[in-house]
Amino acid sequence: MSNVVIMGAQWGDEGKGKIVDLLSREIDVIVRFQGGNNAGHTVIVGDKSYILHLIPSGILHEGKTCLIGNGVVLDPVVFWKEVEALAERGIDVGPQRLMISRKAHVIMPYHKALDVAREDFKNKESRIGTTGRGIGPCYEDKMSRIGVRAGDLADPALLRSKIEAALVEKNALFTALYGREAMSVDAVFDEVMAVGGRLVPYLTDVSSVIEDAWANDSGVMFEGAQGTHLDIDHGTYPFVTSSNTVAGNAAAGSGIPASRLDRVVAIVKAYTTRVGAGPFPTELDDEAGNHMQSVGHEFGATTGRKRRCGWLDCALLRESVRLNGPTDIALTKLDVMSGLKELKICVAYEYNGQRLQHPPQEQNGLAHVTPVYETMPGWDDDITAAKTWEDLPEAARNYICRIEELLGVPVSMISVGPERDQTLNRK
């Protein structure tokens, strides 16, 4: 069985949830390896829609084991709400098939308060568009070696001592710098334990579970969140998330050897979207952009914010290919492009008198590039009922083939609608 990484190749919201859901049919274990509840995966099954922020999309398939790896930052309240919501809809979310790494760090109430206080404190121009869910401050504490880990929820004395130590610094920031009220040790401890205690049965050694799966010849899928260009190191810094979103982090964020990863599927939306602030060379503020936004229902699953829309950017995607080494591409939302008379693909950038095949590496460089476009004919056909490659109009097939040529990676899956069965497989 293969061990496959699913990662977003753009700025997130590429449709990873649907692809994970589809490929979960062939895989026994699904692992979330980074990020927190600042990302949302939407999966539509029949007339039911599921939005998942922490729990892997594979939970919707009976008998699959779903793991939350050490690279994730976990909000206990959000996790438990997802558990209850899925249970109410008849999904088995017991600890025999849903497990959390003891090494995963916990988002504490003071992390969320600090996230909001900092963003409010900044002037409008310096804000990065954080979701305010405490992701960044939690990762900060992890790197500072003062964080609370999921395993600490089983040790109330240790948990309380960590809260006491953390609030010495956090309360100084709240009161002296941000003009907020100090937080109480007792209040924070009680809030966390009210839910945290319920998570204890879900705690496990994720590395060991994966190792056992391999011993039984089971395949494992590693589910990423956000997208490549939100990566803390390789994204459009500082307009990025607080974790490594690239495929290579699947190993570190799950506690497994990188040599076991043998397939990387890059999820690419047929156009480009971005939520929040940050450079976006192909952004559109015209009829075509409005078409993508309205037909594609481009609102964030986590924040509800309207997504910015633009033409497909293959210069940006070349960087994703270089960083992730994908074996194949799953192209999503191709149906949204129906009705556009012509399509444009950014094939390079003009920057400081040079033509670049990849984004400039200096900070703010991407904000000053000029996209170089190729124009292709569009199509009017409704492709949502397409079942085979031949069912697609010639213009759509040509669009896909040009993407393959520009990136040097085959497109193996094509999504033509939100439903599970609205997917073409080109294997």
UniProtKB/Swiss-Prot annotation:
Q: In which pathway does it act?
A: Purine metabolism; AMP biosynthesis via de novo pathway; AMP from IMP: step 1/2
Swiss-Prot/TrEMBL cofactor(s):
Mg(2+)
Which residues make up the binding site for GTP? 12-18, 40-42, 307, 333-335, 415-417
Entry EC no(s) = 6.3.4.4
Extract the GO molecular function terms from the UniProt entry.
Answer: adenylosuccinate synthase activity; GTP binding; magnesium ion binding
Transmembrane segment boundaries:
none
Keyword Cytoplasm in the entry? The reply is yes
Which GO cellular component terms are attached? cytoplasm
Q: What does this protein do?
A: Plays an important role in the de novo pathway of purine nucleotide biosynthesis. Catalyzes the first committed step in the biosynthesis of AMP from IMP.
Summary of subunit composition and partner proteins: Homodimer.
What's the protein here called?
Adenylosuccinate synthetase
Source species:
Oleidesulfovibrio alaskensis (strain ATCC BAA-1058 / DSM 17464 / G20)
Q: What is the lineage of its organism?
A: Bacteria, Pseudomonadati, Thermodesulfobacteriota, Desulfovibrionia, Desulfovibrionales
